[in-house]
A protein has these predicted regions:
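Acidic/polar, compositionally biased interaction segments
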Residues: 18-185
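N-terminal low-complexity, intrinsically disordered "leader/linker" segments enriched in small/polar
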Residues: 1-21
């Protein structure tokens, strides 16, 4: 079923048939304040900055954010699509201080909660890594949503993925895209 230019539904997941006019990277929005493990925070909060992944921190090739340990409270959301290069089980990881969540597929678009996150690394904590797995098909553009929040103290965020044939990596070159017309999906 075609829903719009280049969009179809397959098994309940909105996928992209081709990346044009989509561009490399994820759309990043930063907010003042800690989202306190409430994913809907981002729908009502006013962004302080937004744009694509800057090359100095959250890059097109790496989704990572590291702070200065200044105790500032902030939250970040990244939106876009993940394009698997192989058909197999993908393991996604977030290593964060404090909370981070990642959704891929239909749950990234709507109905996303902490309970249905692909990766649930919630709560206030020092850097810790959590992971989740999902079967993905090569060549299908899956919606992806990553949320991160810093409540105080140290702050860090790194996103990785691996498969049985792909060594764990932060390199998402050619794997993530976003729609500049809608700032994400």
């Amino acid at each position: 079923m075609i829903i719009g230019p280049g969009m179809v539904f397959s098994g309940g997941v909105k996928i992209l048939e081709q990346p044009v006019p989509y561009v490399a990277g994820l759309f990043k929005t930063t907010y003042a304040g800690y989202f306190a493990d409430v994913p809907s925070f981002f729908a009502t909060a006013t962004p302080t900055t937004y744009g694509t992944n800057p090359s100095t921190s959250v890059q097109t090739t790496t989704i990572s954010e590291a702070g200065s340990d200044d105790g500032s409270n902030f939250s970040i959301q990244w939106l876009g699509y993940f394009l698997p290069s192989t058909t197999e089980t993908y393991t996604f990881f977030t290593a964060s201080d404090d909370a981070s969540y990642m959704w891929i597929g239909a749950n990234a678009l709507s109905g996303f909660t902490t309970a249905n996150a692909t990766v649930n690394n919630g709560g206030e904590h020092a850097v810790q890594e959590r992971s989740g797995t999902i079967e993905l098909t090569a060549g299908v553009y899956y919606p992806i949503r990553i949320q991160f929040g810093e409540a105080g103290g140290g702050d860090a965020m790194t996103f990785n993925y691996s498969t049985p044939t792909i060594t764990k990596t932060t390199n998402v070159t050619g794997r993530v895209f976003y729609n500049p017309a809608t700032n994400g999906f």
